[in-house]
């Protein structure tokens, strides 16, 4: 239901940033949640949000300086009604429908 563009992130170990887009292939509005395998090195904004039907949402990723290694972001998503105002609500209710893994490499 979603794709990530670009589908991976490459950063110098000294740190860096990138912009990714969560692109919806769904006919419905989606809520998303971003999880990281390395919260010490990565900062992601927004962590929760919405993507309109067939729309896209901007995701800013910052990699802080640290040891070179591979990590991942997991972007979970769930369909939500058009009038939903809290992007955290479907995940608190266990309504997750799928997820996409984004490989993050610092070298």
From Swiss-Prot:
Residues 1-107 form the MSP domain. It comes from the Eukaryota. Expressed at higher level in testis. It holds the Pfam family Motile_Sperm. InterPro entries: Ig-like_fold, MSP_dom, PapD-like_sf, Sperm-specific_class_P. Gene3D superfamilies: Immunoglobulins. This is Sperm-specific class P protein 31. It comes from Caenorhabditis elegans. The gene is ssp-31.
């Amino acid at each position: 239901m979603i794709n990530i563009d670009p589908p991976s992130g490459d950063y110098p170990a000294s740190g860096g940033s990138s912009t990714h887009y969560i692109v919806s292939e769904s006919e419905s509005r989606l809520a998303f949640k971003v999880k990281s395998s390395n919260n010490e090195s990565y900062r992601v904004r927004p962590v929760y949000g919405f993507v309109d039907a067939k729309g896209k949402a901007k995701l800013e990723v910052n990699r802080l300086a640290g040891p070179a290694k591979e990590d991942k972001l997991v972007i979970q998503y769930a369909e939500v009604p058009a009038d939903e105002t809290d992007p955290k609500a479907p995940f608190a209710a266990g309504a997750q429908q799928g997820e996409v893994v984004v490989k993050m490499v610092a070298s």
